[in-house]
Amino acid sequence: MGRISRPRRGSLAYSPRKRAKSIVPRIRKWPQEQEVRMLGFAGYKAGMTHVLMIDDAPGLTKGKEIFVPVTIVEAPPLMVYGIRAYKRGYFGLETATEVIVPDFKLENYPSKRAKNVTFYKLLERRIKTLPKNYTEEVFQQKLGELEDLVKTGEVVELRALVATQPWLARIKKKPEVMEYAVGGTSIEEKFNYIKEKLGKEIRVGEILQEGELLDIVAVTKGKGTQGPVKRWGVKLTSHKDSKGRRKVATIGPWHPARVMWTVPRAGQMGFHHRTEFNKRLLRIGENGKLTLNGEKIEITPNGGFPHYGVVKNDFIMIAGTIPGAIKRIIRMRPAVRPPAKRPPAEAPQITYISRESKQ
């Protein structure tokens, strides 16, 4: 006789399945590293292709050529525009103070018609409370006050405030702003690292390394309102069932006299905040090009990536799929819980990259 019980359909781990608060994903946990570097980067999802590579992981195919799907994320340089200090509060970390750089002219703005475009002019599209009459003298004064707080030991954590530059990828004008933790053993070396980077661009090759494992944080592709069959995976009812088949046969007992939250119901599907762990970074490219077998090749396939176009900036190649729609902001950090049998830290040997049209 077969079993009369089974696991429930659909996981309750992510309930309530509602839309993310922001399209810019948040990162709450950071790896503990002794190397002084910014713990992560951000880019825009361009599309997918596939490569042939020599498998270097333990297994039956080690040393053989295997087929691997890859995702291309365009990663224009990030602008480090500020530093935020945290102190120990009653309920955890609290913001002690923050210092941002004064306004400056953007030399790399791609438009020929827009002259004298400043960083604040684009940043104020995202932050409405930028300071007025903020001079270099005021900036140096605030930076000195923050350095005094660091020396006294009142500051327990420092984060780098960065802004993306989507105009370099011809995606949009409004930047995304976010903060990143910095690795290191002391608060002083973290402060010196961010202080040196203030007002400067930081490239993905300075932060990430080929072959390392990353955690990908993004907002998934939205599907709108969907029924319980697609949203939760419940089985269709019998063909003799009345009033439809793509429904839940019973939504609960008479008492308690309400529908419980565990019952699979129709509602929002997709546009959820998700983190995927331990994605391998295969390659880092510069200016849309990659070195393969001793020659530079463009990563953009024939006809461009669908719904994206041509990759012209730095980019990263990640093994497998990642959440998010095309052109969506993708954040990444070094893996916080790498597997015990992790692949080699070096980049694998790639023998072929597909540049066939994806149209």
Swiss-Prot record:
Name of the protein described by the UniProt record = Large ribosomal subunit protein uL3
What family, per the record? Answer: Belongs to the universal ribosomal protein uL3 family.
Return the GO cellular component terms, semicolon-separated: cytosolic large ribosomal subunit
List, alphabetically, the InterPro entries matched: L3_arc_euk, Ribosomal_L3_dom_3_arc_sf, Ribosomal_uL3, Ribosomal_uL3_arc, Ribosomal_uL3_CS, Transl_B-barrel_sf
Gene Ontology MF annotations:
rRNA binding; structural constituent of ribosome
Question: Which organism does this record belong to?
Answer: Thermococcus sibiricus (strain DSM 12597 / MM 739)
Q: State what this protein does.
A: One of the primary rRNA binding proteins, it binds directly near the 3'-end of the 23S rRNA, where it nucleates assembly of the 50S subunit.
Gene3D superfamilies according to UniProt: 3.30.1430.10, Ribosomal protein L3, domain 3, Translation factors
